[in-house]
Regions:
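Active-site or metal-binding loop neighborhoods of secreted/extracellular toxin and effector enzymes
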Residues: 113-137, 253-295
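Conserved catalytic cores of phosphodiester-cleaving nucleases, focusing on short active-site segments
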Residues: 34-84, 180-184, 190-207
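Well-ordered, non-membrane alpha-helical segments in soluble/globular domains
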Residues: 73-90, 214-225, 280, 284-287
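Acidic, metal/cofactor-coordinating or nucleic-acid-engaging core segments within structured domains
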Residues: 82-85, 153-167, 172-175, 205-247
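Short His-Asn-centered micro-motif
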Residues: 106-107, 178, 185, 198, ...
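Charged, low-complexity, helix-prone segments enriched in Lys/Glu/Asp/Gln
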Residues: 19-24, 200-203, 262
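Acidic-basic catalytic patches of nuclease active cores, encompassing PD-(D/E)XK
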Residues: 1-50, 93-100, 106-178, 293-295
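Nucleic-acid nuclease catalytic cores
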Residues: 88-117, 224-260
Length: 295
């Protein structure tokens, strides 16, 4: 029998997932510049009361062409560690801050119009793990429960998706939850230092402030939920939005420390910095120094 293998989802353009999402062709992206410094996950906001739920989901895809049934826990955990390295960092961060972390595992080649399509939830408990199988119908019910009701895609539509499942759910009233791009952790202690959001600058010229898009209403809920997550983790840490170019000829990376949230009704940029690419490359130490100057 083939070995059970997992892989990280790859962001792709649009609901059809026709091409990989663009990043800067030579410099890469903040995910690469901060590799090993952050944790990321999907999270829920109950919009009936504006509260971040304790449930965190980390999605991983079962590689097609291999055994699709999860093995015994030791082998399953080994498969996750081969993909994620220090899986315990995610568990440790979540449990230390009152969250309930899980890994959601699924074969993304399934027919997502079939309510009986199978997914697996690996619950990471303080002293062990528990694996639960769920149908697509049950996952949709869970999404609605944790979101405080039905939840649909906004007016901008789905521009980037990390799986065929997310694309399928974007056409329903059980939208897959959004993610935290990165929780920056202090080396050695895993103390949270900031909540990070990554924005792509797709046009020519200098990047535009996130405030412009928030005030237009198009991205309001996205930044409100990020600030709600920050408040849930620690009101003392900042939210930093990092806007980076994807055009080869552009080099300006914009950092903005923001405040937003449903109770504030507006987004405020408290401080900002710029960091430039050099010859199409990012000096990672300079990037980190610029980020740290906002913390």
């Amino acid at each position: 029998m083939n070995r059970f293998l997992l892989e990280k989802p790859v962001p792709m353009k649009g609901p059809e997932r026709a091409a990989p999402a663009r990043i800067h062709p030579t410099a890469g992206s903040p995910e690469q510049w901060l590799e090993g410094c952050t944790v990321t996950f999907d999270f829920f906001v109950d919009w009936s009361c504006g509260r971040v739920q304790p449930d965190l989901w980390l999605k991983r895809l079962i590689q097609p062409g291999v055994n699709r049934t999860p093995p015994a826990l030791p082998e399953l955990l080994d498969a996750l560690r081969r993909v994620d390295g220090d899986l315990e960092r995610y568990r440790r961060f979540a449990l230390n801050h009152g969250f309930s972390p899980s890994c959601i595992l699924f074969d993304d080649t399934q027919d997502w119009n079939d309510e009986n399509a199978l997914l697996y939830r690996l619950e990471l408990l303080p002293h062990g793990e528990e694996l639960i199988s769920l149908t697509l119908g049950q996952i949709k019910q869970e999404i609605n429960r944790l979101s405080g009701g039905t939840v649909k895609i906004g007016s901008k539509g789905l521009k980037i998706s990390a799986s065929r499942l997310e694309s399928a759910l974007a056409c329903t009233s059980s939208l897959w939850p959004g993610d935290a791009d990165g929780i920056l952790l202090k080396k050695g202690t895993d103390e949270p230092l900031a909540v990070l959001e990554y924005r792509k600058h797709t046009l020519s010229g200098s990047p535009t402030s996130v405030k412009r898009y928030y005030d237009s209403g198009a991205d309001k809920r996205k930044y409100d939920r990020i600030c709600l997550l920050r408040d849930r983790i620690s009101p003392r840490i900042p939210v930093v939005v990092i806007t980076y170019p994807i055009r080869a000829e552009e080099s300006d990376v914009l950092f903005e420390k923001i405040q937003a949230g449903v109770s504030r009704r507006q987004l405020t940029v408290e401080d900002s910095r710029h960091c430039m690419l050099e010859a199409g490359k990012m000096d990672i130490s300079r990037f980190k120094h610029t980020l740290n100057s906002l913390l």
